[in-house]
């Protein structure tokens, strides 16, 4: 899980979702997991 100021999609499978006011990226590739922090 990467914590970044700006989250963005890295590949086609990445999806932007919002959980409890946090923007997160979920993907089939675990390396692409991100959340805004």
From Swiss-Prot:
Keyword check for Chloroplast: yes
GO terms of biological process kind: translation
UniProt-listed InterPro entries: Ribosomal_bL36, Ribosomal_bL36_sp
UniProt-annotated location(s): Plastid, Chloroplast
GO molecular function terms listed in the Swiss-Prot or TrEMBL record: structural constituent of ribosome
Entry keywords, A to Z: Chloroplast, Plastid, Ribonucleoprotein, Ribosomal protein
GO cellular component annotations of the record: chloroplast; ribonucleoprotein complex; ribosome
Family: Belongs to the bacterial ribosomal protein bL36 family.
The name this protein goes by in its record: Large ribosomal subunit protein bL36c
Natural source organism: Pleurastrum terricola (Filamentous green alga)
Gene: rpl36
């Amino acid at each position: 899980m990467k914590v970044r100021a700006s989250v963005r999609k890295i590949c086609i499978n990445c999806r932007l979702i919002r959980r409890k006011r946090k923007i997160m990226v979920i993907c089939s590739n675990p390396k692409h997991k991100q959340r805004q922090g």
